[in-house]
């Protein structure tokens, strides 16, 4: 909540500053606020993930200030700075899923079968660099982005299942559904600080000042470092954003 309030104050401050100073006529400034929905997921559903039991929508917000310049004909360039949150919470059923966890104060590793809950939360500063194409009141855009994570969490627990230590034929460790009998894990320290990807989207100007926008961002780097091997599949951040925008100039 503190981050949200601070972000709103920052965005309001930038907007007021932009209206108080002289902005070159060739530049278009836009303030944005949106909602992110998506997940960190592997490309394709691996055989070890048998079923998605639930997906919990969390409060993912995005604030941004962009500057766009028309260069030739209908083509232009857009960049800016965004403060955004990308998070998820899922419950899945897995089989022979490689995991490392803590149960009863002891760290164990092996092949897990049963229910698994994962929570991921990322706050980041994102810099997009996008080509734009203007078509009437529409502005189509696409290009790469880079994000720096200021906050990163990836944790969860397993329950109603069992772990075979070492390999699928190893000693069996039962997992219950109460806090003392579940296995917990935390891989936040193994997450990358920097993320790279591509962003495709469109802005629609409804009035002279207000409009709507939608974007799809697809991470090209996994959320964990390449040296992280506990989860066998690489997890990519894939999110869509919808929101409103205000043309500062």
Regions found by a protein language model. Name each.
Residues 1-32, 131, 244-248:
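Bacterial Sec-dependent N-terminal signal peptides
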Residues 20-68, 147, 191, 247-249:
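Short glycine/proline- and aromatic-enriched beta-strand/turn motifs that initiate or cap beta-hairpins
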Residues 29, 59-65, 123-129, 196-200, ...:
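Hydrophobic, lipid-facing positions within transmembrane beta-strands of outer-membrane proteins
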Residues 35-39, 83-87, 135-137, 146-152, ...:
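Transmembrane beta-strands of outer-membrane beta-barrel pores
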Residues 39-58, 86-122, 149-195, 221-239:
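Extracellular/periplasm-exposed beta-strand and loop segments of Gram-negative cell-envelope proteins
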Residues 74-77, 137-140, 208-214:
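Repeated loop/turn-to-beta-strand initiation elements of outer-membrane beta-barrel proteins
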Residues 203-205, 209-221:
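A hydrophobic membrane-anchoring alpha-helix module
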Residues 204, 236-249:
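Outer-membrane beta-barrel "beta-signal"
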